[in-house]
Amino acid sequence: MSGWPRIYYKLLNLPLSILVKSKSIPAEPAQELGLDTSRPIMYVLPYNSKADLLTLRAQCLAHDLPDPLEPLEIDGALLPRYVFIHGGPRVFTYYTPKEESVKLFHDYLDLHRSNPALDVQMVPVSVMFGRAPGREKGEENPPLRMLNGVQKFFAISWLGRDSFVRFSPSVSLRRMADEHGTDKIIAQKLARVARMHFARQRLAAVGPRLPARQDLFNKLLASKAIARAVEDEARSKKISHEKAQQNAIALMEEIAANFSYEMIRLTDRILGFTWNRLYQGINVHNAERVRQLAHDGHEIVYVPCHRSHMDYLLLSYVLYHQGLVPPHIAAGINLNFWPAGPIFRRLGAFFIRRTFKGNKLYSTVFREYLGELFSRGYSVEYFVEGGRSRTGRLLDPKTGTLSMTIQAMLRGGTRPITLVPIYIGYEHVMEVGTYAKELRGATKEKESLPQMLKGLSKLRNLGQGYVNFGEPMPLMTYLNQHVPEWRESIDPIEAIRPAWLTPTVNSIAADLMVRINNAGAANAMNLCCTALLASRQRSLTREQLTEQLDCYLDLMRNVPYSTDSTVPAASAGELIAHALQMNKFEVEKDTIGDIIILPREQAVLMTYYRNNIAHMLIMPSLMAAIITQHRRISRDALQQHVEALYPMLKAELFLRWEREELASVIDALASEMQRQGLITLQDDELHINPTHSRTLQLLAAGARETLQRYAITFWLLSANPSINRSTLEKESRTVAQRLSVLHGINAPEFFDKAVFSSLVLTLRDEGYISDTGDAEPAETMKIYQMLADLITSDVRLTIESATQGE
């Protein structure tokens, strides 16, 4: 590039460098999209805009990609490195330039015909300034239409700092030439496909237009389901039809979001400023799968785990910065207080009551509203656990909203709905102190402005945040496989509840929980907490802690929990240094070295972080516990132990493996433990390696409390085979509370009601007890004896004496 064009671009770049602060999506385009910078790269933009081109250039130079303004020289021919698909509008509309894209595509394809070694990577790129979707019945053109020069100037002036450059996966022109030829018709087809690609990408980033709120309410009121519910309300409560209709409108006002792009922009500024000061980084993994789903036109339902009130903001912020539309979020009605409620509502929150029971009008209005969101194409987010986890483990799923999602599909006419499980992890959860109090019996504080301000005032260094997108679940594919006849239940008017709905929803919910856990994120805090809580004195020397973290990291890297889970790339020493900055641990120095201590008052709180990754380490921990207690054990006996206990662990921690996969998992973990020197293999028997017995014991401690809990329930069941389920749950909790006091167990979930409830249900499903409450004494005693061998004698005595003393 020389002469006048260079001067022109330099002059144009001056205001752009001041006004525009764009973001690249993905963050590292070459690495994440697999671009080969040693091969020629050309860029395709949707329409002629020099401002877009220079914005793209700034991102290319920042990410070591070829400069789009530098032409490509191929076989002596100089070709522009960028192509505009459409000439774009002009200030003077009577002048319409000839579109050059087809000619340029043809020139590039022609070069591939004459040069078999050539392979140009064609990279589609969208540059967007602002993402307002606009309102229905608004302007004729969408807000992100092609702009002429004057319009573009105002758009950049106002929205230059809310812009992003979206790189799409490259297309190989060599493959195009080989498979489809190089004539002009193929070039025209290529330009047409590129136009469709950009239109889809724009919809994925901006979303459908927003309805006027009153128009939405009028449409809902006119629906047959709500009209019938209003009539029922008037009849059952003996009120006028108008009054019943007003009740329905009041419920719509209570439920419906009031999405505002300007509020999204403002909040993005505030959150960007806040995150940079509170978090040392937000780590996002597998976002490309979601971008692809949005691009392919899927109706996306985000299903994250629920750790904190921060989840709402963090996930919307992450999605916005991944070039996706922030979803409409189902939020608990407890958050609908001033000023949080109105703000959340403008950020896309719609509010849901804890229970729908006894209020047919409410359930109908909510179901119709959710169905309307799906039919209009808005992405939706809800927390399938129904509330925040107080223990750090996943809660049993609440299936009401999921059931309504499938019922929306049974109305017909919606785009394919895909559920996207999401694991959210933190190194610091601001509510963790409150959770510990609630688990001890304190009444939950009602959310309010003073409580919110109190929480915000305590925010300090929050370390790293993690958002891992799990394996998506296309609902249509799932139903086709598991309920082939589901289409027979489609009814565009009535909310259908076919016989297959409840078991299918339960199965989908359980699968979602497994997929959320599959995307788990290990981090410095949860690894250090796991190691220190495994030590009976909650303290380890720096060397011991480093060795233990190395053990965990090697297990997770060499035998990954799943392909979606993430493990820090940092070394054990670096992770410890980072964790110490969080001010949760104390360091005592003596003449020999450092001792890292988890203070007693912090220990209960830190179990929360340990529990976040308990599922990722429970299998090696269980194996270590069995080997440690037996000193030596054959592979077959080890497998029998694991298989006997696995159904309880799978149900409690939403583990991913089926029973038939256990043998290969055990073999892989045993090989890794042998490689680390934790165990030795002699005559097909696994033996403790005395030189690494401490590391193995600390690894085994991860399963210690779980095994003690199971021992309690199996002992009670063996001692009283006719005990009913509710009494078994209650007595198990009582013994667990006693055990925690006598043996200093600092884990609130140790006697959590939900944990024992889940365990007793699993025992019923596995046939240890029947619905009438009769246990099979021989079987339960056999499992108890197995568990008794895996716990210490003093704990065993406490358990057995608890029932003998009654």
Swiss-Prot record:
Alphabetical keyword list: Acyltransferase, Cell inner membrane, Cell membrane, Lipid biosynthesis, Lipid metabolism, Membrane, Phospholipid biosynthesis, Phospholipid metabolism, Transferase
Membrane-spanning residues: none
Record has Ion transport as a keyword: no
CDD domains in the cross-refs: LPLAT_DHAPAT-like (cd07993)
Pfam families linked to this entry: Acyltransferase, GPAT_C
Cellular component GO terms held in the UniProt record: plasma membrane
Gene Ontology biological process terms in this record: CDP-diacylglycerol biosynthetic process; fatty acid metabolic process
EC annotation from Swiss-Prot or TrEMBL: 2.3.1.15
Membrane disposition: Peripheral membrane protein
Principal localisation: membrane
Motif (HXXXXD motif): 305-310
SUPFAM superfamilies: Glycerol-3-phosphate (1)-acyltransferase
UniProt pathway annotation: Phospholipid metabolism; CDP-diacylglycerol biosynthesis; CDP-diacylglycerol from sn-glycerol 3-phosphate: step 1/3
GO MF term set: glycerol-3-phosphate O-acyltransferase activity
Classification via InterPro entries: GPAT/DHAPAT (IPR022284), GPAT/DHAPAT_C (IPR045520), GPAT/DHAPAT_LPLAT (IPR041728), GPAT_PlsB (IPR028354), Plipid/glycerol_acylTrfase (IPR002123)
Domain description: The HXXXXD motif is essential for acyltransferase activity and may constitute the binding site for the phosphate moiety of the glycerol-3-phosphate.
Protein name (record): Glycerol-3-phosphate acyltransferase
Lineage: Bacteria, Pseudomonadati, Pseudomonadota, Gammaproteobacteria, Enterobacterales
